[in-house]
Curated annotation (Swiss-Prot):
PANTHER family: LARGE RIBOSOMAL SUBUNIT PROTEIN UL13 (PTHR11545:SF3), RIBOSOMAL PROTEIN L13 (PTHR11545). This is Large ribosomal subunit protein uL13. The gene is rpl13. It comes from Methanosarcina acetivorans (strain ATCC 35395 / DSM 2834 / JCM 12185 / C2A). The keyword Signal does not apply. Pfam families: Ribosomal_L13 (PF00572). Part of the 50S ribosomal subunit.
Amino acid sequence: MLKMTVIDAKGLILGRLASSVAKQLLSGDEKVYIINAEQAIISGSRAATLREYRETRERGATEFGPYFPKRPDRILKRTIRGMLPYKRARGRDAMSRLKVYVGVPYELKGAETVTIPDADMRLLSSSRYVELGEVSQKMGSKF
């Protein structure tokens, strides 16, 4: 039986959260559930961050890809996927042990949550950041 870890993404820096979760998934001994994905933050200026995500989303053709998600849970999952060897069996197995949610789902209400101290937003030297939910809404998501 795999150990279950529930991580609350509220106030955690997206990249640092993703790298920590990727390491946990590659160790192979636990399932990871991330809740409140829309409250994860991206450091940097609001305008530059929104522009980068919009340009990434508009890249390529709608029929042929690359396909980039709008919803915050999917953006977070895609970010973690970029840190895994997802085209190999080890990476596919790691991705299958990951679940990301907007808000808190019914089955995880009351579950003990863990935070990642290295990814806390209080470690930022600047107060410039944007929440993942806001980026998602600016790209047209209706989560």
